[in-house]
């Protein structure tokens, strides 16, 4: 019998109160006795820390600690240690008698968190003579020692031979070693296992029924059915793997779609850019050639325009020079014509003004006479009126006042005064001796003098009148002379006028002849100018024709030019029609090319599809009929492959069924036999012979024959009753009576033959059976057959997969052919449009060259035609003047006539000044008058007038004196005043007469004054008009003299000359303007050509540079394309017909899709981002290659046999479809039935209930106080029991859960549990978690601890219903049961030669009475368990070992004094060694 391992000792180093203390542990009970604070709990804490060095679990608290939680910062360990290195070490002797030292090194960590550092270690192979304290301390002297560090301990142990020291970095490794060496009862793999172990020790330490232990009894007592669970897990794992594989297939299908999308978009992205660059390269080359062609053409055009410009510039310069001369001549002719016209107008004005002046002079003379007469009468009227006024005044003065009128004296006094006033004549007449008496004499003298002055004045006035008329005629004659020959001196006018009149008579005859001469000269000059114009035109014509022609050849040339015009006109007309025909043909070619270019992409797509079909089928098709015939062959091939595939599938399913049948446990081919065997209490015959060898299998198979599937029962009579009404069984059911444990084949009489047996069933019934070729009797035979079937199934599966692949491939090929026929068959076998396009392009090039040549010829013909027309036009102007051109004497005749005209030129003024001479002739004699004599006469006349006025005044003054001579005698009348009434009356009458006379005189004077004013106004007006016209006439004479021409008949000639010059100037200007416009147009054309040439040169250089630059990149692109073999994918000819914008749009759209497609692939994303550089097209090829490489790396070479991703995608679709079908079938086979699950769980529950009953038998004798017995009740929960019933009998009602592909079996089980128990709240747990719990049988069970207490009978063990001692005893019993259960569960994991240590704790054992303690001792002895009890000093057990602990303080140094004693019933009680204090 294997001995159980025991804990030998516990060593504490540097704990609080213990410096180096070793407690030897008793084989049963070790008691720690001492008062409060003696160190009992510290010792137990050191033991527990060495067992479970997990700081997350350790929490040492007092039993009286209130409110303690696991979250407290101080777990109680820090305060039990001292500063420095501390140790807690267990010395163990296991079942193999191996000494194992396990423990932990502890050290306080500085800080307010009160943490402790723990390092577990183990020592193996340590000699028994070496105590743990010798290893952990170093003696310095007799009174001092020190604790060694862990490294020093390691070094010390490594120095010992055969000793192994191991330090652990994890608690799991530490516990794994302790489990393997038998120190702990269970392998503590996880924190959960350690927690269970710690809670168990904690429950034993503090005693009582722990609620934690009670709630977790299932976890402690019921072992995990790992086999069943693993079977479920394997099934679910297989299903999960199968479904994951299916999901992976779906993902792969989505990846396939992604791959297709990726390769499609990548192809679009790169191919569009590739073809765009190819198109652009071709376009750039064409443009470069076109630019070069245009460059050469422009250069030739520029040279031609430059030559043309030079010619036109030279001609324009000639015309400019001629225009200057013509403008000068024209301006001179215009000026001369203007002068002639001005002179004529002036002459007409002069004649008109002279007529007006003559008329005005006559009227003025008449008006002067009228005014003179009117003045005389006015003077007479004034004198008369004045005399009347004087008389009236005198009478009024006399009659003003009657007193005054009567006072004559006063009047005389007044007269006297007036007479005195008249005495002023004395001074006026220069007569100082004048007296009133001598006044008469002097009056006569002065009147005679007045008469003489008046006569002299009248004589001078008459002379003055004659002199005025003569002077006027002189002025008129002088003006005419000045008008004819400019101003002269007045004294020379007579001689000049007489010469003019005499010469005018002589030259008038010559002037009459000059008109005819001048007309003849004008005619000849006109003909001369026409001749000169004709010569100029002929010179221009010859210059334009580039050849000198004689006058005689012009008519012939005219006929030749007309003939040439006719022929060229026909040629131009025909050329127009021919050009239209060529243009129309060119448009037809372009239209045909456009149609073919639109059809080409469709044809290319059809060809690509046809090529793919040819590659897939390996055939070549030349017509649509061949395609349809091959499609019919595909249909036949598909039908044959489907038939063969279905046959292989049927055989495969048959083999699967046979394998399933042979795989039944016990060799039962019918599952009903197992149920019947269980029902009858028998065993299948195949189970009895399950171990038969492969060689004996044919014999026993033939021996039993049809009864090889019989049921062996102990007693047939007991079965007979159950056979009545039996329906659920095979058609033939064989029952054999016998003992299944000692069954043999002696029930038959058998004769063995060669490969056969004869079985004598009865005397009248024999059975002959040959050995089967494939024996199935016995496990070996079945396994052999299963292996054979598996091999055959593998070959059939491979063949089925191949056929399925071929069928799907054929179906896809059929679909491809169907799509091809539907979409492309109509255009596939038509002629190649690209070839026809190339031919049309060649034809179009030739046609364009023809059109260009025709345009050039037509342009030359047009130029010749225009030149001929211009020549004919010029000849049409020249031919009518051939006579003039031939007349060589014209210039001589003009000179001759010019000489004759010069002779008559002197008489030209007769025509110009004929009127002046006609007027001058009658009055030229007036020119004799001397203007200076007229001025002297005017002065004499003025002097005579002044003398006559002075004489008149003197005579008048003397007359006044003579008249008032009587008044001088009234000197004394002032004093004499008297009146006379008669005289007053007379005076009044005279006054009335005088007033009337005065009125008549006044009226006459006023009327005559008004008339005189009118006469004066008329006279002033006439004088003003006369003076104005005289001044104008003088101005006109002066202007005419300034003009310096004579208005004669040359006006017509001047106008004709000016008109001729104007026509020449206009023609010259018109030609010059034409040349200037042509020159400007030529310069503009040259500028345009120059700019165009520069632009063409720049564009050509840029394009050539671009072509050369792009060539390197394109070569790199082509090298990449050819090296990687992707040209077939990228060179999509149908894209060549799309524009650059369409290709760029296509590439951009594909780029957007690719960004989304490669968003999760960093490599492709980076390559794609790099490839977006438009200047580096090769990077797009690199991206395409990277995509291909990426897809190649993801091709399953074991499934897909190609390197081309496109072909791989096609094969992938076929293979994935086949795998999906196979995995779906496999999932249906893997799925376990719900009834099987219920049966497995029920059997497991029954087994565990039986085991718990066996454990209860060991607790029946346990008693504590009133507790007589302890037991465990195991019951199935009602909700779970209902679930099992439904799974076994009503599962078909819930097949919607178990047949769902979306749910695993665990999830379906959880859904069913929720459906059956809707009132239970599942919380946040997932269906998978709930299902996994429902697959664990432990969750179906409820466990309760019951005690048989006194008269109450069996009660549920609760701390409230038990005393403290009863609770502690009951709990300890349950814990012992748990430990034993753990050992039983772990026995298969640990070596069979090891029995683990058993040790529990009990603190504060004073709560138990002596009987209870004795019961614990008996329990420990019976179960071979060690127990450590902490008790106060009043407990002294009779058995085991007791340590008395006393804490003392010496010299401020605290230590625990320990004394150990054996039990009282020991034969020789003695103190245990090592009890001395080592503090």
UniProtKB/Swiss-Prot annotation:
GO terms for molecular function: ATP binding; DNA binding. GO terms for cellular component: cytoplasm; nucleoid. The keyword DNA damage does not apply. Homodimerization via its hinge domain. Binds to DNA via its C-terminal region. Interacts, and probably forms a ternary complex, with MukE and MukF via its C-terminal region. The complex formation is stimulated by calcium or magnesium. Interacts with tubulin-related protein FtsZ. It comes from the Bacteria. GO terms for biological process: cell division; chromosome condensation; chromosome segregation; DNA replication. Residues 138-163, 331-664, 831-1112, 1206-1257 form a coiled coil. Gene3D superfamilies: 1.20.58.850, 3.40.1140.10, Immunoglobulin FC, subunit C, MukB, hinge domain. PANTHER family: CHROMOSOME PARTITION PROTEIN MUKB (PTHR42963), DUF4476 DOMAIN-CONTAINING PROTEIN (PTHR42963:SF1). NCBIfam families: PRK04863.1. Keywords: ATP-binding, Cell cycle, Cell division, Chromosome partition, Coiled coil, Cytoplasm, DNA condensation, DNA-binding, Nucleotide-binding. Plays a central role in chromosome condensation, segregation and cell cycle progression. Functions as a homodimer, which is essential for chromosome partition. Involved in negative DNA supercoiling in vivo, and by this means organize and compact chromosomes. May achieve or facilitate chromosome segregation by condensation DNA from both sides of a centrally located replisome during cell division. The keyword Cell cycle applies. ATP binds at residues 34-41. The lineage of its organism: Bacteria, Pseudomonadati, Pseudomonadota, Gammaproteobacteria, Enterobacterales. It holds the Pfam family MukB_hinge. It is found in: Cytoplasm, Nucleoid. Residues 665-782 are annotated as: Flexible hinge. This is Chromosome partition protein MukB. The hinge domain, which separates the large intramolecular coiled coil regions, allows the homodimerization, forming a V-shaped homodimer. Belongs to the SMC family. MukB subfamily.
């Amino acid at each position: 019998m294997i001995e159980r391992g025991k804990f030998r000792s516990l060593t504490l180093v540097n704990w609080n109160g213990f410096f180096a203390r070793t407690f030897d542990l008793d084989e049963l009970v070790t008691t720690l006795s001492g008062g409060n604070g003696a160190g009992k709990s510290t010792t137990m804490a050191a033991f527990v820390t060495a067992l479970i060095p997990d700081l997350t679990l350790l929490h040492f608290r007092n039993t009286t600690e209130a409110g303690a939680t696991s979250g407290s910062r101080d777990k109680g360990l820090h305060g039990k240690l001292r500063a420095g290195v501390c140790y807690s070490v267990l010395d163990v002797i296991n079942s193999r008698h191996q000494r194992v030292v396990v423990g932990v090194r502890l050290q306080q960590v500085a800080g307010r968190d009160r943490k402790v550092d723990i390092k577990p270690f183990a020592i193996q192979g340590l000699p028994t003579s070496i105590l743990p304290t010798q290893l952990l301390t170093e003696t310095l002297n007799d009174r001092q020692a020190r604790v060694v560090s862990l490294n020093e301990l390691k070094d010390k142990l490594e120095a010992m031979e055969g000793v192994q020291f191991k330090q652990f970095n994890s608690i799991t490794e530490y516990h794994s070693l302790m489990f393997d060496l038998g120190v702990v009862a269970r392998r503590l793999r996880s924190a959960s296992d350690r927690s269970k172990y710690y809670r168990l020790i904690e429950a034993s330490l503090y005693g009582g029924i722990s609620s934690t232990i009670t709630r977790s009894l299932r976890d402690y007592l019921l072992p995990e059915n790992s086999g069943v669970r693993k079977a479920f897990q394997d099934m679910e794992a297989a299903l999960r793997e199968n479904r994951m594989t299916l999901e992976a297939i779906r993902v792969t299908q989505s990846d396939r779609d992604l791959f297709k999308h990726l390769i499609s978009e990548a192809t679009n992205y790169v191919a569009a850019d590739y073809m765009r660059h190819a198109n652009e390269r071709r376009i750039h080359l064409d443009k470069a050639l076109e630019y070069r062609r245009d460059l050469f053409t422009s250069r030739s055009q520029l040279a031609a325009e430059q030559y043309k410009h030079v010619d036109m510039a030279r001609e324009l310069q000639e015309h400019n020079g001629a225009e200057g001369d013509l403008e000068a001549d024209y301006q001179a002719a215009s000026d001369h014509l203007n002068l002639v016209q001005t002179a004529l107008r002036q002459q007409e004005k002069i004649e008109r003004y002279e007529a007006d002046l003559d008329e005005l002079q006559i009227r003025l003379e008449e008006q002067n006479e009228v005014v003179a007469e009117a003045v005389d009468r006015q003077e007479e009227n004034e004198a008369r009126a004045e005399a009347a006024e004087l008389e009236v005044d005198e009478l009024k003065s006399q009659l003003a006042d009657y007193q005054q009128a009567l006072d004559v004296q006063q009047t005389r006094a007044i007269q006297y005064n007036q007479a005195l006033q008249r005495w002023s004549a004395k001074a006026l007449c220069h007569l100082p001796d004048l007296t009133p008496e001598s006044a008469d004499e002097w009056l006569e003298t002065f009147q005679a003098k007045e008469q003489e002055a008046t006569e002299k004045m009248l004589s001078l006035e008459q002379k003055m009148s004659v002199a005025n008329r003569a002077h006027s005629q002189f002025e008129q004659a002088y003006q005419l002379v000045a008008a004819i020959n400019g101003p002269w001196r007045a004294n020379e006018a007579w001689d000049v006028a007489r010469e003019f009149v005499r010469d005018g008579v002589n030259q008038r005859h010559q002037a009459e002849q000059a008109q005819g001469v001048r007309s003849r000269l004008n005619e000849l000059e006109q003909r001369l100018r026409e001749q000169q114009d004709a010569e100029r035109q002929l010179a221009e014509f010859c210059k334009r024709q580039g050849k000198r022609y004689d006058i005689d050849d012009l008519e012939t040339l005219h006929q030749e030019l007309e003939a040439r015009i006719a022929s060229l006109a026909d040629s131009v007309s025909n050329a127009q029609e021919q050009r239209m025909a060529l243009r129309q043909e060119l448009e037809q070619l372009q239209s045909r090319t456009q149609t073919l270019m639109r059809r080409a992409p469709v044809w290319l797509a059809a060809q690509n599809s046809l090529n793919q079909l040819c590659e897939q089928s390996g055939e070549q098709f030349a017509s649509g009929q061949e395609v349809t015939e091959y499609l019919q062959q595909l249909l036949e091939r598909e039908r044959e492959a489907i038939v063969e595939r279905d046959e292989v599938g049927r055989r495969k399913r048959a083999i699967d069924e046979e394998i399933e049948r042979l795989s039944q446990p016990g060799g039962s081919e019918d599952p009903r036999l197992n149920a019947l065997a269980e029902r009858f209490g028998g065993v299948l015959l195949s189970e009895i012979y399950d171990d038969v060898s492969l060689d004996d299998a044919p014999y026993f198979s033939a021996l039993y024959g049809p009864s090889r599937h019989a049921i062996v029962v102990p007693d047939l009579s007991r079965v007979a009753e159950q056979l009545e009404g039996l329906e659920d069984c095979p058609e033939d059911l064989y029952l054999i009576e016998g003992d299944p444990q000692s069954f043999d084949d002696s029930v038959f009489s058998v004769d063995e033959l060669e490969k056969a047996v004869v079985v004598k069933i009865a005397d009248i019934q024999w059975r002959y059976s040959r050995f089967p070729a494939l024996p199935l009797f016995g496990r070996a035979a079945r396994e052999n057959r299963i292996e054979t079937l598996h091999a055959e199934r593998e070959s059939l599966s491979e063949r089925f997969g191949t056929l399925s692949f071929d069928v799907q491939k054929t179906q896809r090929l059929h679909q491809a052919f169907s799509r091809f026929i539907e979409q492309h068959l109509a255009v596939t076998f038509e002629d190649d449009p690209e070839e026809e396009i190339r031919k049309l392009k060649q034809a179009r090039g030739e046609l364009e060259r023809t059109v260009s040549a025709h345009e050039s010829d037509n342009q030359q013909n047009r130029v010749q035609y225009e030149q001929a027309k211009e020549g004919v036009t010029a000849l049409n102007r020249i031919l009518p003047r051939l006579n003039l051109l031939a007349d060589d004497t014209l210039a001589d005749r003009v000179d001759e006539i010019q000489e004759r005209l010069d002779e008559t030129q002197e008489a030209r003024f007769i025509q110009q000044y004929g009127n002046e001479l006609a007027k001058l002739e009658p009055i030229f004699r007036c020119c004799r008058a001397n203007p200076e004599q007229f001025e002297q006469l005017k002065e004499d006349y003025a002097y005579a007038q002044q003398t006559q006025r002075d004489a008149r005044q003197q005579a008048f003054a003397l007359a006044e004196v003579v008249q008032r001579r009587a008044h001088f005698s009234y000197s004394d009348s002032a004093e004499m005043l008297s009146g006379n009434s008669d005289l007053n009356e007379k005076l009044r009458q005279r006054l009335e007469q005088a007033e009337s006379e005065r009125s008549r005189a006044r009226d006459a004077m006023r009327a005559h004054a008004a008339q005189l004013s009118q006469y004066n106004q008329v006279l002033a007006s006439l004088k003003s008009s006369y003076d104005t016209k005289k001044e104008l006439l003088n101005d006109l004479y002066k202007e005419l003299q300034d003009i310096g021409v004579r208005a004669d008949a040359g006006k017509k000639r001047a106008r004709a000359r000016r008109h001729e010059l104007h026509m020449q100037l206009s023609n010259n200007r018109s030609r010059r303007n034409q040349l200037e416009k042509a020159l400007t147009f030529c310069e503009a054309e040259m500028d345009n050509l120059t700019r165009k040439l520069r632009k063409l040169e720049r564009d050509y250089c840029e394009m050539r540079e671009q072509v050369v630059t792009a060539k390197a990149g394109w070569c790199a692109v082509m090298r990449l394309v050819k090296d990687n073999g992707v040209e077939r994918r990228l060179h999509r000819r149908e894209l060549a017909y799309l524009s650059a914008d369409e290709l760029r749009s296509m590439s951009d759209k594909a780029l957007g899709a690719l960004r989304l497609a490669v968003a999760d692939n960093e490599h492709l994303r980076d390559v794609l981002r790099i490839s977006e550089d438009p200047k580096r097209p090769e990077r797009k090829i690199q991206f395409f290659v990277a995509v291909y490489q990426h897809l190649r790396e993801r091709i399953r070479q074991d499934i897909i046999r190609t390197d081309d991703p496109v072909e791989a995608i096609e094969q992938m679709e076929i293979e994935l479809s086949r795998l999906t079908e196979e995995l779906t079938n496999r999932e249906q086979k893997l799925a376990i039935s719900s009834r099987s699950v219920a049966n497995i769980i029920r059997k497991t529950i029954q087994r565990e209930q039986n085991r718990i009953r066996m454990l209860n038998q060991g607790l029946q004798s346990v008693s504590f106080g009133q507790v007589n017995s302890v037991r465990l009740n195991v019951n199935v929960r009602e909700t779970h029991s209902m679930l099992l019933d439904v799974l076994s009998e009503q599962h078909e009602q819930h097949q919607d859960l178990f047949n769902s592909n979306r749910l695993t079996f665990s999830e379906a089980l959880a859904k069913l549990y929720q459906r059956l128990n809707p009132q239970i709240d599942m919380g946040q747990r997932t269906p998978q978690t709930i299902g996994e719990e429902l697959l664990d049988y432990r969750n179906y069970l409820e466990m309760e601890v019951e005690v048989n207490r006194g008269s109450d009978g069996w009660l549920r063990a609760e701390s409230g219903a038990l005393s403290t001692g009863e609770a502690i005893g009951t709990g300890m019993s349950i814990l012992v049961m748990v430990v034993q259960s753990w050992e039983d569960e772990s026995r298969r994991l640990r070596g069979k030669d090891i029995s683990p240590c058993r040790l529990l704790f009990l603190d504060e054992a004073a709560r138990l009475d002596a009987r209870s303690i004795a019961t614990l001792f008996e329990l420990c002895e019976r179960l071979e368990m060690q127990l450590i009890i902490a008790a106060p000093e009043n407990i002294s057990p009779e058995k085991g070992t007791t340590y008395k602990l006393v804490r003392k303080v010496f010299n401020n140094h605290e230590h625990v004094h320990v004394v150990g004693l054996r039990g009282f019933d020991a034969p020789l009680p003695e103190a245990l060694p090592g009890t001395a204090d080592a503090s």
